[in-house]
Amino acid sequence: NYALPRGLGNIYVSVAKGYRAGGYNIQSYSDLSQQLLRRQMMLGVRQYSEQVIRQIPHMPDAVKDKAIAGMTGVLDRVTPQAPDASTLYYKPEYTWSYEAGIHHNLADKMLQLDLAVFCMKTHDQQIARFAQSGMGRVMVNAGRSRSTGVEVGLRSQLAHDRLTLTANYGYTHAKFTRYDLGTSASGTRVDYTGNRVPFVPQHTFSASADAELPVSPDNFVRTFAFGADVKGAGSIMWDEANTFGQKFYATLGAHVGATLAGNVQLNLWARNLTGTRYATFAFDSMGHRFAQYTAPRSFGLDVKWHF
């Protein structure tokens, strides 16, 4: 950390290692138990059927062998694979984070600039997904990923600190650098290396303007405030295969408020004035796609009393 002269800010560099504990997928235990029970039942049917066929009198052994082979082929196709108990446990996640940036005061300290670049390298990244049955969620380790990006923020206070302007933007390039699941049960190669990491917006931005005007300390209305803001994010992928996601979206909000005598604050607000419809979360389960969407235009009134 290096402080700039004349109180103009500071330049910093940081390196940190993060750790996220592993654990157990309790919700998937019932799936593995049912898979094991189905497998044992089918193996029992196979063994019993073979014994019955072997005991059929007056049937040539060649015919018995052919009947057993045909039965075995059918049962093999419907018998579940042996459950993999290792899926009950997911490993810890490790992350090395590198960041460099500057906090800089400009225009006689009327404008503050925050700028940062970062790189995060994650090993055994933990990602939540639904269990194969669609009932419950499990955590899996996704190999390695790398996230690089930049964040910039501007803040200015004008008119004797009565007007505050802010603007922020962030860009993140997050991809899997190694996420090879091998060959699936259907024989399909599953390799997500190079795909985007889900749930990470590629772009984020916000801007706001807020004003607070003093009236009189002796009036019933002491101060009057109003402002507006715009926020946006996207695009966002919802799965490791990058098959569906949320495009970039933006919303507009506004508020009007006042501070009254007796330490009472009123704030009338409006959110999503643009009526933008976007998904805040989405997933595939049991052959269907589900999504949770944001609230439509919303209006409200907050009343606060400080005592």
Where are these regions (language model features)?
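Outer-membrane beta-barrel strand-turn architecture
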Residues: Y2-R6, Y94, L106-D108, K121, ...
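Extracytoplasmic loops and strand-loop junctions of Gram-negative outer membrane beta-barrel proteins
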Residues: T79-T87, Q132-M139, G187-T193, I236-E240, ...
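Transmembrane beta-barrel domains of outer membrane proteins
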Residues: N1-A3, G101-N105, G153-Q157, N168, ...
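Membrane-embedded beta-barrel scaffold of Gram-negative outer-membrane proteins
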Residues: Y12, L37-V140, R146-T148, G170, ...
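Residues that define the transmembrane beta-barrel architecture of outer-membrane proteins
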Residues: Y94-Y98, R146-V150, F199-F205, R222, ...
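C-terminal beta-signal and adjacent terminal beta-strands/loops
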Residues: Y19, K121, A159, V230-D239, ...
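Transmembrane beta-strands of outer-membrane beta-barrel pores
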Residues: L4, V15-A21, S28-S30, L106, ...
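Gram-negative outer-membrane beta-barrel transporters
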Residues: M110-H123, V138-D239, K304
